[in-house]
Amino acid sequence: NSLVIVVGGRPCKINVHRSLVLLYNSSSLLCSGTLINQEWVLTAAHCDSKNFKMKLGVHSIKIRNKNERTRHPKEKFICPNRKKDDVLDKDIMLIRLNRPVSNSEHIAPLSLPSSPPSVGSVCYVMGWGKISSTKETYPDVPHCAKINILDHAVCRAAYTWWPATSTTLCAGILQGGKDTCEGDSGGPLICNGLQGIVSGGGNPCGQPRKPALYTKVFDYLPWIESIIAGTTTATCP
């Protein structure tokens, strides 16, 4: 299940997640994504599935609000040089909406970063993923948590299989308790713009010294800008 949860967070205030996008199909909530301009959403490549739709402007999954908008993917782009057999390799996907969305009380794009985050930075994560690391408890409204950018060495120690590359971020709380979890995949890591995309992590979530892995958006900016500008053959770092 590609959904990740925010464990140890609290319900997000209604005005802080205007860029958060819900990816879903007929049977389930799949992932989150982030609106980066009126026509484009950024999410994780491992969130791709056949017939998904996107909802923007959602707060409670159960209670519809007048600002909600539904969109379909018009085009989807993943890195052409992504390893097919490695789910976390270049875990980034750009989606062009079938038609643009307008800014509203609950919908607004999030800016891309002008510089990468430094170790120790405090960032926000958010999503509709599981809110218990042991039970299948999913919230109606997205949960938010503050976590820290950690040194790559922490993730390398936690996940020996992980080829810690410069194009990923390691983030969490060393003592555990706050983390992204099942259901949050593809969602944002936010500090001075969209710094990361939820990619993978420990199971169960929120364990001490088992932070999560995030695709480092800053390193993909040239690719993102090329695709949006129409150069669809651009390769990724």
From Swiss-Prot:
- Quote the record's activity regulation: Inhibited by PMSF. The amidolytic activity is also inhibited by benzamidine derivatives.
Tell me the ranges covered by the Peptidase S1 domain, including all copies.
6-229
Q: Which GO terms describe its molecular function?
A: serine-type endopeptidase activity; toxin activity
A Gene Ontology CC term for this entry? extracellular region
Supply one GO BP term.
proteolysis
- Enzyme Commission number, as recorded: 3.4.21.-
Q: In which tissues is it expressed?
A: Expressed by the venom gland.
Q: Which residues form the propeptide?
A: 1-5
On the tree of life, the source organism's domain of life is: Eukaryota
Compartments in which it is found: Secreted
Q: Which PROSITE patterns match?
A: TRYPSIN_DOM, TRYPSIN_HIS, TRYPSIN_SER
Keywords for the protein's UniProt record, in alphabetical order:
Disulfide bond, Glycoprotein, Hemostasis impairing toxin, Hydrolase, Platelet aggregation activating toxin, Protease, Secreted, Serine protease, Toxin
Q: What is its main location?
A: secreted
Q: What is annotated as the active site? A: H46 (charge relay system), D91 (charge relay system), S185 (charge relay system)
Query: What positions does the record give for glycosylation?
Result: N25, S28
Cite the record's note on assembly: Monomer.
Q: Which family does it belong to?
A: Belongs to the peptidase S1 family. Snake venom subfamily.
Functionally, this protein is described as follows: Snake venom serine protease that induces platelet aggregation through activation of protease-activated platelet receptors (PAR1/F2R and PAR4/F2RL3). On F2R, the cleavage occurs at Arg41-Ser42 (like thrombin cleavage), and Arg46-Asn47. In normal condition of hemostasis, the cleavage of the Arg41-Ser42 bond liberates a new N-terminus that functions as an agonist. However after envenomation, the cleavage of Arg46-Asn47 bond degrades this potential agonist. This may explain why the snake protease is less potent than thrombin in causing platelet aggregation and release reaction.
Query: Protein name, please?
Result: Platelet-aggregating proteinase PA-BJ
